[in-house]
């Protein structure tokens, strides 16, 4: 949400699409974080309808760069086998539809994916090869000084360096980057 707010504040046209939370929950979080830039929000799970919504938002503000934020990939359905059939293959086909849409319209997508109980990316490994960057967010459980902080790491980046690590603390108004020296 903070990223969607920042992108909108910097002149972007952003749709935050979630099936993980209700729009009411999303609104409450936006208010708590005091996000002010008014990005669009939706709850579409069917990718063809989602992309139609994207077209409408892009047409309303054609001069602004468009960013689609999806929370999460595993809740989307490409519609190939009906509206209620969601599985790993559905996620692959949905991601393919989104990446093809972005390539053909010069839009950008940030797709949030789920993880398994042991912290691995949910779904097939092919998903990693379909994206330009893979960024993980985890909870620090080993270092006593950073216990409970979030670790943001780049695992893959086609356009720059990977293996970058950032430590984030969760504050009342969202994430705040911290350095190891600031917590000791």
PLM features per residue range, with description:
Residues 7:
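Aromatic pocket-lining residues of Rossmann-like dinucleotide-binding sites
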């Amino acid at each position: 949400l903070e990223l969607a707010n920042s992108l909108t504040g910097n002149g972007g046209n952003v749709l935050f699409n979630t099936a993980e939370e209700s729009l009411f929950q999303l609104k409450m979080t936006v208010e708590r974080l005091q996000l002010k830039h008014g990005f669009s929000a939706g709850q579409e799970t069917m990718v063809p309808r989602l992309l139609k919504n994207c077209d409408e938002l892009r047409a309303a503000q054609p001069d602004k760069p468009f960013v689609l934020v999806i929370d999460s990939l595993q809740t989307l359905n490409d519609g190939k086998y009906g509206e209620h059939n969601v599985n790993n293959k559905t996620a692959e086909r949905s991601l393919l539809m989104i990446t093809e849409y972005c390539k053909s319209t010069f839009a950008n997508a940030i797709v949030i994916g789920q993880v398994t109980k042991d912290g691995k990316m949910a779904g097939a490994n092919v998903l990693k090869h379909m994206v330009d960057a893979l960024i993980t967010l985890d909870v620090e459980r080993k270092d006593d000084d950073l216990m409970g902080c979030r670790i943001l790491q780049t695992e893959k980046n086609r356009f720059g360096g990977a293996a970058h690590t950032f430590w984030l603390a969760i504050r009342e108004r969202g994430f705040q980057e911290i350095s190891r020296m600031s917590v000791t």
